[in-house]
Design a protein with these regions (language model features):
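Active-site neighborhoods and metal-handling regions in enzymes and metal-associated proteins
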Residues: 1-176
Length: 176
């Protein structure tokens, strides 16, 4: 969990920080069952969302939908990141996006939610196959405005497409 300006870092940073009014909090939860891992990521806003944050949320939402739609059997992993890049770049966020948008999850011990390779990056030729599990994350770090917005979920590739393993809706979590 990162909050305030540290939400821009994308991944957890150690140390304490008091959550303040109008902070942004990036939360990543993971859970393991019989050594299989799943995770979700959300940015939660304490207070009201600014117009910049609402725009970033809309772009991140569009990106995660496009990325999810791009995942399927016999599809190169790179196609998922191409969808990620297309949405962010067309919305003017090329400089605010990360260079990869997810990774595989597997049955590991000690439980870990990052089973690499493979990372999901543009040009990755590895084909998705039924039974493969991936964590997709759409993350923006707008250092100019001081805002972050992240959304991530776990999916499994099926014979006919994909199944998202979280039932949580894609919505902006804020007090507004």
């Amino acid at each position: 969990m990162n909050c305030g300006h540290r939400a821009l870092y994308g991944r957890s940073v150690s140390g304490s920080h008091t959550i303040k009014d109008n902070d942004q909090v990036t939360i990543e939860f993971a859970s393991s069952y019989r050594r299989y891992t799943t995770c979700i990521m959300r940015t939660v806003l304490v207070g009201s969302a600014s117009s910049v944050q609402r725009n970033m949320f809309n772009v991140v939402s569009d990106a995660i939908v496009a990325m999810t739609d791009a995942a399927g059997p016999d599809t190169p992993l790179g196609n998922i990141d191409d969808a990620h890049r297309r949405v962010f770049d067309e919305a003017g966020h090329k400089v605010h996006r990360y260079s990869a948008c997810g990774y595989s999850l597997g049955a590991t011990f000690r439980p870990s939610w990052m089973d690499v390779p493979p990372m999901i990056y543009s040009g990755n030729p590895l084909l998705c196959e039924p039974g493969m599990v991936f964590f997709l994350h759409a993350m923006l770090a707008n250092t100019d405005a001081g805002y972050a917005m992240s959304f991530g979920h776990t999916l499994v590739i099926t014979d006919n497409g994909r199944e998202v393993l979280s039932g949580l809706p894609i919505e902006l979590a804020s007090n507004s």
